Amino acid sequence: EDEFGTLYAAFDNMRANLRTQISEAETAKQEAEAAKEQAQAAREDVESERNEMEALTGHLELKAQQYSDALDAAANGDLTARVKTDSMNDAMAEVGEDINTTLDALEDTIADMKAFATNVIQSSDRVNSNAERVDRASKQVSKSINEIFEGTTEQNEGLESAAAEMQNLSATAQQVASSAQQVADTSQSAAKVGEDGREAAQEAIAEMSAIEAETGETVEEINALDDELDEIGEIVGVITSIVEQTNMLALNASIEAAHADGDGEGFAVVADEIKGLAEETKEAAADIEGRIEAIQEQAGDTVETMESTSTRITEGVSTVEETVDALETIVEYTEEVDTGIQEIDRATEEQARTAQDVMGTIDDLTTISQQTATEADTVAGAAQDQSASIEEVSDSATELRQRADDLESLLDRFTVENSAGTGTDSTAAVGDD
């Protein structure tokens, strides 16, 4: 602000000098006019001189106004305005050159300051962005280190627990070996039972197959009986037909006996007896036919039952065969279990020896884990310190950006060319048409 105040003061001095020169020119003009009045007689001689003085005065007034406009524009922030330096007065031309030189220098300075402020803002933003990333990374590292510290602590506890478990494992290895032998004995017994079960199942299959065969024969015999009953039914039908014909003959005989009066009495008695016998025969045939139908219906039910029984026997045979397969598989598995148990017995002995080696390794791991926990705690502290430093850098960058924003706001009131320090050859001069 002091530099701008100095510039403003310089501009004011320049304007004051211009006003002084203008005032002097006015005075000279007045003196010339006075001389004109005093030397009216010599008007022809001084007319030319007076015209020149008026032209010079007008020129000086125009130049002074142009210079004043350029300085006013600069004072209002427009540093692109320039003045024409050609003048009828050498001093005035020199003043114009000084004004242009001053404005060039001031414009370049303001442009450089604007570029500097922009660079500071961009750099501050990048610093802030990088600081935020580093801060996040530092916090993540700190979090990871804390997790490592907690993990190593849990690991120590786990290793101590593992050491105790290994001692228990070593102690129980012999118990496992003893139990394995007992299981081996039990598996052998199970194999024997499975073998006996397989033999019994095979005998059951043989018996069920025999029953299935006998059932099939029974079904065939019942079907044959049904066929014979059908034939008997046909015979009964024939008898029924004969009885109906006999009834018809007896009826005709009775009619003829009635026509013969007394001579046909004995014949009528015989006809009645034949008719009665035919009725009894018809009733007996109907009874036989009913019984045959009942026997056939019962035989049909028996056949269905026998066929269902045969189907179930077949399914039972299939189930027993599956049971035999399962028993054979159990026997095989039992033999494999027996072999596996023998291997377990050998493995438990090896496990007991290995457990001692593992306990030594666990002790070494516990020591390393404790060292890791200590180092992780140290690194976590350093990461926290780094995070605090990054936050300070971020705060400083934020403050720097704020100040750069303030500077840019102050510089925005000045109008300059786009590129800083490039000169003013292309800048329009004040007073151009």
From Swiss-Prot:
Protein's membrane topology: Multi-pass membrane protein
Segments for region (Disordered): 24-48, 379-400
Entry annotated with the keyword Transmembrane: yes
Compartment(s) of residence: Cell membrane
Domain HAMP: 58-111
Domain of life assignment: Archaea
SUPFAM superfamilies linked: Methyl-accepting chemotaxis protein (MCP) signaling domain (SSF58104)
PANTHER family given in the database record: LYSOZYME-LIKE PROTEIN-RELATED, METHYL-ACCEPTING CHEMOTAXIS PROTEIN MCPB
Function comment: Transduces signals from the phototaxis receptor sensory rhodopsin II (SR-II) to the flagellar motor. Responds to light changes through the variation of the level of methylation. Also acts as a chemotransducer.
Protein name: Sensory rhodopsin II transducer
Organism this protein belongs to: Haloarcula vallismortis (Halobacterium vallismortis)
